[in-house]
Amino acid sequence: MSELVMDSAFFGHVLQDMGALIEKERDYLTGLDSDIGDGDHGINLSIGFREVNKQLDELLTVSPDIATLLKKSGMILLGKVGGASGPLYGSFFMKCGADVPGKTEVNFDELCGMIINGAAAVQHRGKAELGDKTMMDAFLPGVEVLQNRDTNADPIETFSAFVDAMHAGAQSTIPLIAKKGRALRLGERAIGHLDPGSESSWMLMNVILENLKKAV
């Protein structure tokens, strides 16, 4: 069991940094989506995370526990982010929060469980499998790393391997034909393009990694 402990302030910083990342990469993610989707992935995520960060101080004051913070953030994303990514990311954060009811601190094993179950909620919502050219092509390889982790290993090394697996999974979408979403209609024309949801998902999980490094 790791001694690494994360409190509500940690997750507040994560959400702030996720918002900053999305602002920085908004045009890049929107460009990816323009190739095979509606061309609004980065824009929609920007709208959602701006609203989360707008309400963040109030959320941390009114809802000091991690569960409520993440569930309310997920509900904001669900309501503010258009397209498929709103329900998917909303489901992820809401499930992460639901996993730790009333807690103001979680350890590394609990964090891993939150992410594993959050990814399962995304899969349940989107009904996507590995190879469908969706964010599950990033999440599923990453989840496998967390599920098979050595609980005695260094948490940073474990989470780095998780993020690396997600990044590789995102890259694996480039040669795929899409089986879900708007890209489905393109058929073979989707080959050669990176799935925007898989790209944003590993990038957002990397934000958690960077904050874990600061917490050690």
Swiss-Prot record:
Its EC number is 2.7.1.121. Pathway: Polyol metabolism; glycerol degradation. Pfam families: Dak2. Mg(2+) binds at D33, D38, D40. ADP binds at H41, G42, I43, N44, A84, S85, G126, M135, R182, D195, P196, G197. ADP-binding subunit of the dihydroxyacetone kinase, which is responsible for the phosphoenolpyruvate (PEP)-dependent phosphorylation of dihydroxyacetone. DhaL-ADP is converted to DhaL-ATP via a phosphoryl group transfer from DhaM and transmits it to dihydroxyacetone binds to DhaK. Unlike the carbohydrate-specific transporters of the PTS, the complex DhaKML has no transport activity. Residues 9-210 form the DhaL domain. It catalyses: dihydroxyacetone + phosphoenolpyruvate = dihydroxyacetone phosphate + pyruvate. Keywords: ATP-binding, Cytoplasm, Glycerol metabolism, Kinase, Magnesium, Metal-binding, Nucleotide-binding, Transferase. One of its GO terms (molecular function) is magnesium ion binding. Its cofactor is Mg(2+). InterPro entries: DhaK_L_YcgS, DhaL_dom, DhaL_dom_sf, Dihydroxyacetone_Kinase. Homodimer. The dihydroxyacetone kinase complex is composed of a homodimer of DhaM, a homodimer of DhaK and the subunit DhaL. GO terms for cellular component: cytosol. It is an enzyme of class 2 (transferase). This is PEP-dependent dihydroxyacetone kinase 2, ADP-binding subunit DhaL. SUPFAM superfamilies: DhaL-like. It is found in: Cytoplasm. Coiled coil: none annotated. It comes from Listeria innocua serovar 6a (strain ATCC BAA-680 / CLIP 11262). Its main location: cytoplasm. Transmembrane segments: none annotated. It comes from the Bacteria.
